[in-house]
Amino acid sequence: WEDTNGNTITKALVGDEVYLCADVTDIDDGATATIKIVEKDDEGEDDDIESVSGKVQDGKIKAKWKVKYTEDNDDTESQKEMEEKGYTLPEYAFTVECEGVESEESGQLDVKDEIVLTVKNFDELKGKTLKLVWKDGSSKEIPIDSEKLKISDIFIGSAYMLIK
């Protein structure tokens, strides 16, 4: 898994564009391979999510994928996570298949429950507080102390913002 800058990653946000990358051997450049993405399950019953294709170039395959939210409700910890957060976070992996041969599974990509907000009018808002409020009434307050606000452990879903 790589980000758009080519850095290896193990975590991403829903909506991030990531690259699925793998070294390949004994496959000619230009050959098309299928990359199968799964949502990992503790019990080994992984859920098929999507397949994308890419061409082998210089002994590597690379394909772009947009991280999506898939409910992970069949792990042993799913119920606990649902009770604590109100949702579950998926973990993804992929395999590459070409000419009838399937690769080993990739490392895992964990979906993070955070957002990064850019404060365009920071000079006006510095020192104030941003309050996020979700449909169920839960909320989180964040001090506006930077032009980039990284907010972790948030709920998935729409929220409205108040500045006070």
Language model regions located:
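Short, hydrophobic beta-strand segments
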Residues: V56, I61-T88, I151-F155
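Structural motif
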Residues: V24-I27, I115-T129
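Short Pro-Gly-centered beta-turn/loop motif in secreted/extracellular proteins
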Residues: K148-K164
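Short amphipathic beta-strand segments in non-cytosolic proteins
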Residues: I37-I49, K131-E141
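Short beta-strand elements
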Residues: E99-I115
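Structural beta-strand segments of beta-rich domains
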Residues: D16-L20, D113-L117
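Short, compositionally biased P/S/T/A/G/V-rich stretches that sit at domain boundaries
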Residues: W1-V14
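Short, acidic Ser/Thr/Gly-rich low-complexity loop/linker segments typical of extracellular
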Residues: V52-V56, S138-K150
